């Protein structure tokens, strides 16, 4: 049975808590969630570490995203991705 992603849309910008996603599919789930963003729309990712490998993957995408660190550790990193192109 499919599980819903741990996505909170209580705020004006949806948040995805990736800690709750199995590690094996985490990056794929994040890329899928980012694919739903139109130009000008944002999403916040909550990660258990600084996701540098993920940031490199996102930089290589056809779509472009502005990246803003909202919180940097020690237990969680909150990063806002805003689609720019």
Predicted feature locations:
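Positively charged, polar, low-complexity stretches
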Residues: 2-85
């Amino acid at each position: 049975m499919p599980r819903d992603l741990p996505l909170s849309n209580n705020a004006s910008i949806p948040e995805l808590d990736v800690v709750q996603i199995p590690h094996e599919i985490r990056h794929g789930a994040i890329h899928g969630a980012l694919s739903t963003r139109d130009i000008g729309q944002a999403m916040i990712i909550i990660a258990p570490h600084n996701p540098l490998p993920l940031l490199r993957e996102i930089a290589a995408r056809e779509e472009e995203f502005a990246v803003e660190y909202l919180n940097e550790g020690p237990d969680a990193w909150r990063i806002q991705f805003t689609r720019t192109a």
